[in-house]
């Protein structure tokens, strides 16, 4: 499969020079390139809600920085993003609300301030992990 050039409009695609690889089969793409392609596909139709699983895995620092900006921009104009991550610093910087799930069960949720208080999200997570062992 190839990506039709008419669908290439994303700033991320242009900045990360993915356009030079658009004639290649997607199966030949690296994990990071596939991740960028999935992000472009999610954003290309200007959604109000995006759900992502570990969106930063496989991204280079430049692409990760751009994605964070895209996420913040979508939320700033009234959109919403649900995403899972094990990188708690990213969640702490990006999220207005957070939920911590363990073993498929919700163990804490609320605004970032409600969940973490004066602690870091990582400290709260580790405390909850220790308490449930």
Predicted region positions:
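ABC ATPase "signature
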Residues: 109-110
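Conserved ABC nucleotide-binding domain
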Residues: 11, 15-28
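Helical segment within the ABC ATPase nucleotide-binding domain
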Residues: 65-77
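A short, surface-exposed alpha-helical micro-motif characterized by mixed small hydrophobic
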Residues: 91-93
């Amino acid at each position: 499969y190839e990506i039709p050039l008419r669908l290439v409009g994303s700033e991320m695609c242009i900045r990360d020079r993915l356009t030079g690889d658009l004639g290649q089969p997607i199966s030949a793409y690296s994990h990071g390139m596939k991740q960028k392609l999935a992000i472009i596909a999610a954003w290309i139709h200007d959604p109000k809600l995006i759900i992502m699983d570990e969106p930063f895995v496989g991204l280079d620092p430049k692409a990760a920085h751009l994605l964070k900006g895209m996420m913040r921009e979508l939320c700033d104009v009234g959109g919403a993003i649900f995403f899972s991550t094990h990188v708690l610093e990213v969640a702490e910087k990006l999220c207005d609300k957070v939920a911590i799930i363990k073993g498929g069960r919700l163990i804490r949720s609320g605004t970032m301030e409600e969940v973490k208080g004066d602690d870091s999200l990582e400290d709260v997570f580790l405390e909850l992990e220790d308490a449930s062992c």
